[in-house]
Amino acid sequence: FDEHNRLHCLTDRAGFWQPWAESGEGLMPAPSAHADHAPAPWQLGASTWLPMGEQAYLASWTEAGFGHLGIRTADGTIDDFTGEYSRFRSLALDDEFIYCIAASPVYPSAVVRISRTDHRVDVLAGGVAPLPPEHISRPQTLCYPSGGGQAHGFFYPSMQGEIKPPVVVFIHGGPTSACYPMLD
């Protein structure tokens, strides 16, 4: 609920988990990317978006496997706070900062504080990489035919030049989980 006691929720009525809000005409979609704005809804306790009044909201969403973070206003413009991160969870905010658990392909999960004015990121806890970032392979999105549709994944190219490293494949047991482009 927002400060005007209007209900805000996520629904997949349009094919993606997207924000909707109560209005005089019933439940209406909020302006949003054609992308999922939440992980599987049976993973309870997630905070992936927050209403900010007058149809503005803070949200994380996933496009081509990579997470994004931004404030979307009623006119549809987005103030993008994604930076170098690719996964955002447990969103909170105040007048000055956005707080969340964020991770990237080269840094593990960290509690971060992001300035709403200059987008400066402060790591409050965690996020210590076990290797220098230049030694960590970065994921590339990958789509390939599977059954009657498309499967999606990430390819991590070798950081060793011509030396072929072993192939590591992560398969999730969906639909309850997914793979994310983050160091874990």
Locate each region found by the language model.
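Short strand-connecting beta-turns/loops that link adjacent beta-strands
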Residues: 3-4, 12-15, 24, 54, ...
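Hydrophobic beta-strand positions that form the internal "hydrophobic ladder"
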Residues: 6-8, 56-58, 98
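A flexible loop/linker signature enriched in serine peptidases of the S9 family
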Residues: 8-21, 32-43, 60-68, 84-85, ...
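Hydrophobic beta-strand positions in blades of beta-propellers and related beta-sheet-rich domains
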Residues: 19-21, 27, 49, 68-71, ...
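Multi-bladed beta-propeller domains
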Residues: 1-2, 11-12, 22-47, 72-89, ...
